[in-house]
Amino acid sequence: MSERRSVDVPIGTPLSRDEFEAAIRAVGAERYHDKHPFHKLLHGGKLDRGQVQAWALNRYCYQDAVPRKDAALISRVHDRELRREWLHRVLDHDGLPPDEPGGIERWLVLTDGLGLDRDYVISMKGALPATRFAVEAYVRFVRERPLIEAVASSLTELFAPSIHRERIAGMLENYDFISDDVLAYFKRRLTQAPRDATFALEYVKKNAKSRDEQEACVAAVGFKCDLLLSLIHI
């Protein structure tokens, strides 16, 4: 688990809600994966088709893990309001056919558009072992760590919309094998991620009462940033 970030408040004193949120956002400002050189190459059209395929193939492991970690979180929750709120995350990714295909299906539309065999993508046989290990570590984190930390680990969604906007614009401009339709996953996340992040942030700010709990939540965001970085070391 990532080292807990220090905050300029006396040890043991709980942070104010604003200080706590600032500490969470500082993790993203320093460690979110949008700063990795890979994304500059991807969005700038500097990768060949095979490299883009490798990224999408590898990333599918994460897409597959997301509804499983959300279901794991729901299974631990006694609060009906939180369960109801979190349930839509599972449906966002798994879909509710025929009207809502879901995020996993949208990712497969991307890999289809890149020329990858769908069954091969779903099998995850072509993904790096380190990627499979990392995403399963995320599922275990959400299943086993205190609930407040499990919720906090989702807060990288606070930082996601900007990278999605950059990706949509950059890939459409720079790759002739990318069309508007295959980027539907990222377009949908422009509205889903802020909604989810707003709820999770308020939940964490309300329920992390002690300084130790607050620091653990900040560390959980750092853990998730490390996970996302591991997915692009391909």
Predicted ranges, named:
Residues 13-20, 77:
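Anionic, Ser/Thr-rich low-complexity intrinsically disordered regions
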Residues 44, 51-58, 149-152, 185, ...:
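Non-transmembrane, amphipathic alpha-helical segments
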Residues 51-101, 105:
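Extended cationic-aromatic binding surfaces that line active-site or macromolecule-binding grooves
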Residues 20-21, 26, 84-185, 226:
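Active-site-proximal alpha-helical scaffolds that flank and shape metal-associated catalytic sites
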Residues 4-7, 20-47, 66:
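Short alpha-helical hairpin
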Residues 185-192, 202-229:
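C-terminal, helix-dominated tail/subdomain
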